């Protein structure tokens, strides 16, 4: 029997965030997530989906002839077969990224994958789910992301940046304002005032298409 994954959608669009923001990318959105962040913009991926073989997923990805592939969710690592999918995507020559909540062990993920680890802030309502052991595994190919809901979240993220030396461990540290919760101009001003070694990140796809699935 072939390995399978439960998939919500596979689509081709522009990457809205991370270091490849603005670049055409194929997104493979896996179904299911053990977290319930209060600002989640992909709750439609919590359940449902279609059970598909890895071969069928790879075939669809190849049909777009992409350079970049992003495996996202939900929480992709909640499905064990995400690990072989990531490896096979790398073997096929794509530049692969993984968007993960940071609540699950990333050690088995192929080192060629850029792991985008989302450290949950107090404002997410899931801060207790952070797996800080993952920080020791970060390399220059990886990225750490904070979604910030308030000044309190910002101060918390700065404390973690300093405590763990995140800018020395990961290739990028990304600060994003939670949509409709934190004013992006305020966040920009705070980053400049504190001279932080982080990248301000806005979700390009929301500016272009709001929260339309498949975009």
Regions found by a protein language model. Name each.
Residues 29, 72-73, 203:
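A secondary-structure boundary/capping signal
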Residues 19, 40, 49-52, 69, ...:
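Short linear functional motifs in flexible/disordered or boundary regions
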Residues 78-215:
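Conserved AdoMet/S-adenosylmethionine-binding subsite of the radical SAM
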Residues 5, 24-25, 35-113:
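Conserved Radical SAM active-site core
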Residues 15, 58-62, 162:
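Generic structural signal for well-ordered alpha-helical scaffold segments
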Residues 1-49, 64, 206, 210-215:
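N-terminal [4Fe-4S]-dependent radical SAM core
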